[in-house]
Curated annotation (Swiss-Prot):
Compartment(s): Cytoplasm; Golgi apparatus membrane
Record region (Disordered): 297-316, 571-680
Protein name: Protein HID1
Lipid-attached positions, N-myristoyl glycine: 2
Organism of this sequence: Mus musculus (Mouse)
GO annotations of cellular component type: cytoplasm; cytoplasmic microtubule; cytoplasmic side of Golgi membrane; cytosol; Golgi medial cisterna; Golgi trans cisterna
Record carries keyword Cytoplasm: yes
GO biological process: insulin processing; response to glucose; secretory granule maturation; vacuole fusion, non-autophagic
Biased composition (Low complexity): 297-313
Residues with Phosphoserine modification: 653, 670
Amino acid sequence: MGSADSKLNFRKAVIQLTTKTQPVEATDNAFWDQFWADTATSVQDVFALVPAAEIRAVREESPSNLATLCYKAVEKLVQGAEGGCHSEKEKQVVLNCSRLLTRVLPYIFEDPDWRGFFWSTVPGAGRGGQGEEEDENARPLAESLLLAIADLLFCPDFTVQNHRRNDVDSAEDVHSLDSCEYIWEAGVGFAHSPQPNYIHDMNRMELLKLLLTCFSEAMYLPPSPESGSTNPWVQFFCSTENRHALPLFTSLLNTVCAYDPVGYGIPYNHLLFSDYREPLVEEAAQVLIVTLDHDSATSTSPTVDGTTTGTAMDDADPPGPENLFVNYLSRIHREEDFQFILKGIARLLSNPLLQTYLPNSTKKIQFHQELLVLFWKLCDFNKKFLFFVLKSSDVLDILVPILYFLNDARADQSRVGLMHIGVFILLLLSGERNFGVRLNKPYSVRVPMDIPVFTGTHADLLIVVFHKIITSGHQRLQPLFDCLLTIVVNVSPYLKSLSMVTANKLLHLLEAFSTTWFLFSASQNHHLVFFLLEVFNNIIQYQFDGNSNLVYAIIRKRAVFHQLANLPTDPPSIHKALQRRRRTPEPLSRTGSQEGTSMEGSRPAAPAEPGTLKTSLVATPGIDKLTEKSQVSEDGTLRSLEPESQQSSAENSPSDGESSQTWREQRRLSNASASGQWSPTSDWILSWKSKLPLQTIMRLLQVLVPQVEKICIDKGLTDESEILRFLQHGTLVGLLPVPHPILIRKYQANSGTAMWFRTYMWGVIYLRNVDPPIWYDTDVKLFEIQRV
């Protein structure tokens, strides 16, 4: 009964607030206490009992009352942090205020007139004490709120265990507390593993929800190419003003990386016991990636209003980014810490892949997108971590889940963002030689995927999945084709033995991309052919010995190369090719690609359910903006190429002058030529046809085709295995052109990808927070909410 009464009283207070036309004095504690003092409302109750329309009504009609509600709620949190929340009543007040602010803040952010409200100073309202500390009291409300949340996240007996049992109830005790002794979980920089405590986890989660809501002001600003628009909430929270920055960063990272959803591995245990840890881990992962939203391409220090200022620190060489969370992340260096992080992320990413004999017997986590963003941030901000990942085969424990997600999401339009981040991570990894070398490890783990069965290496898995994405993904994935093929180009010089299945897939892609209707239907389509020819050239020149399957496939499909060499350039042929083009082509025909049987236990990639919510994404830069070319020297080191030599040495990627927007738009096969905006000319075809890198392949065909034909005639052979045996023992030493230098296209950070990551990350957070629906139905500007 008590609970029902408290909900009723709370609802009455809300109605009073919305109906009062006169401002309620901040000193009227009897009125304001109704919102937090005597209620035991859950966060779900608060969302149900405080409707969006009523918050907006108060904001428009009695703004001073909404302002006072926020002041008073923050004041209560500050008092709780100062006093240490010793009584149950104090703890309840803190939780109630936290829930109320989580509900109200998005409606403050959505109104531009209110946006500066939390950054204004409130005399006397910033701190609980009535002392002479005018400077303290003049803190902006946002700063008081953020510091209170930080203090409360390390509050003994509320969010952490009390190490001292002598009950010193003094405020000094709270301020002298060394929160580094209270890190939530063992791992990086902390060896002690505290006893799990359900209540503490729940309280942490509520406070992290509020913190995430504070940070979410970014959702209410439209995407802008200037990534200088720093989030003032994140900037202050991750500054030296927050004395808990280091222990909180460590707590969040360790909580995520130490989590094991399977636990003791007892089947169905997740059905018997609720896992209270997972919601905390999700919240920790989301807060962590938002605090790390720092553009590594810029180094200016923005102020609260977004303008950049020079400081005395700028002249000196700064120790690292001003964002302490980014700084701490970039300075992790111990091997055991890297091992802990990598194992933790790999374990969680692999969790949805766990297949047992008992369906649904293991708990499946849902926050793999947040984990991929976290992994990206780790590799981007800490190059030592990236090299550690690539130093051993452990990188394959990240690769396989990413390929699983890419394959699974390829038909689902609501998961385009997941496809992009998976491909971006692989592009980043492929810029390092070690990644290509690691791919030669045999692939023996059989993750059920909707792809043809093959026996081979992780390189085979990568190429077979990429082929599946290109030939049977939905149309919105076409801008990714360049990235997918760039990854294959980057690793190709190191691939020792591709399987026959994979060799056929690569040749099928070349066959599809080199049809005249495809080549002539958009101004950039020929780049895909250049990429594939570069793959073949790299393998022939640098890994010929082990790749008899690919050489055999090239010989069998030699007509494709001859057609390319003799591509028609006269206007009637161009017209005829475009006429032949089907009216609404699929992304690519799958005819000619032997699909074979799919893996046992796999299910086809399914499109999104109609009505599924998704968030829009800003466009990604073209491959020319995403990467820079480097040449591999003889000693294996990389040398960055000057733009001019890039231009001449490889015509197979768009020139810097070409806008990436046109690059994306023109790739739309369905309407490229129909739109009439662009049509191919003889001069245009001649401009790139002469640069097709066919010399190596033509020389190979010139030498090997007569030999293979002779063997077949002499021995009456029709058996592939005999021909393959001949090719395995053959050599082209001295017969091929001089090997070309290996070109690697390394990912480079830029403001375009920084903005893409920001919109993607907040879109994921928006859609994942449905209980309670913190931002649902508010006027977000960073992205659009769409239904599939």
